[in-house]
Amino acid sequence: MLFFVAGSMKDRYHTLEIGRLGGAVREMGELDNTVFIYIVGDNGTSAEGGMNGLFNEYTYFNGVAESVADMLAYVDEWGGPTTYPHMAAGWAVAGDTPFAWTKQVASDFGGTRNGMVVHWPKGFAAKGQVRTQFSHVIDIAPTVLEAASLPQPSSVNGTVQAPIQGASLVYSFNDAKAPARHTTQYFEMFGNRAIYHDGWMARVVHKLPWAAQPITKLADDTWALYDTRSDFSLANDVAAANPDKLKERQALFLKEAIANRVLPMDDRGIERVNAALAGRPDLMAGRTSLTLHSGMKDMSENVFLNIKNKSVTIVADVEVPAGGGEGVILAQGGRFGGWSLYLKDGKPTYSYNYLGMQRSSVTAQDPLPAGK
């Protein structure tokens, strides 16, 4: 039920806000000459909930498994403000019908394909029609530029711009049978990779969305081949019957991967969120101390010390009023994971919240006296 309620709420919200935007443009007298491009969806449904679902999605992002027993303890709270639940993967697969896979599986249309609506009365005469030419999100910028009769920028504020990839979709607006101009496209995420070319799709499913580790090593992956012209949902693997075509597509993927800096391929998952583990530049890299002042709140995690799984020392200058102090001194995170240093009944207390599954606190015996 939660799955359908959430979808219904999103649909109503989107409909309302799009209606407001359209109404404002209509009042300006520019509705017929305004290009509306509405992409419906978010690269498939989310399967991170695994086989049983989650009461706190942050457990997934921290690589911590939830057991059914863990979740049953929250059965009466499920869906309320004390949980941050995620549906089971079965719901995600059902939501991506007729495709086999979900978000994160960039090598399947279930993890990439979305509907799109274009509205531009002065730009084309067709109404209520469907276009089937292959297209990709990188086609949107060229489409907008052509519709507005603008050239692709060669530089912005003195910075030379890389050429915009993709092909404008304007050619298809008044010609449903026009040959597709976007004929080749690579896909890759977490080692899940594919290449589309002239109606054929070669792909690898390397890592499942709910799994901590890939299925195999990258070098041991098995490729599949599909003819999307007759197999919309990628249901029939024809690699065995077309070995030469599969080899051609594999070589083409490698060419595109090199050209678009996909290599070296990184099939890690959660580790890539942590800059120190991922090996990428980090604003706070090497910092061992940080000074904060009163009023500094709602700071992004990227501008705070990474203290995960580390011992830390917190030194706080506080002024305790007469009658005792109360309240938070420093906190990171919240209900679904984090820690806090605060005064409770005047006593310094440190609390650690392990992803909502376990809470630990240490409290001083005596309250702080008044003064600094």
Residue ranges and their predicted role:
Residues E27-W120, R203, L208-Q213, G279-M284:
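Histidine-centered active-site microenvironments of extracellular/periplasmic hydrolases
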Residues M1, G50, I140, A202, ...:
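Long, internal low-complexity/basic segments
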Residues P81-F109, F124-Q133, V137-T228:
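C-terminal cap/loop subdomain of S1 sulfatases and analogous C-terminal strand-loop tails that border
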Residues Y354-K372:
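Short, aromatic/His-centered strand-loop micro-motif at the edge of beta-sheets
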Residues G22, N33-V35, S46-F61, K127-G128, ...:
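Short, solvent-exposed loop/turn and secondary-structure capping segments
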Residues V328-T349:
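Glycan-recognition/cleft segments
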Residues G7, D11-H14, I18, V25, ...:
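Beta-strand elements within well-structured catalytic alpha/beta cores of enzymes
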Residues G19, A24, T313-E319, K372:
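Residues within well-ordered beta-strands of beta-sheet-rich folds
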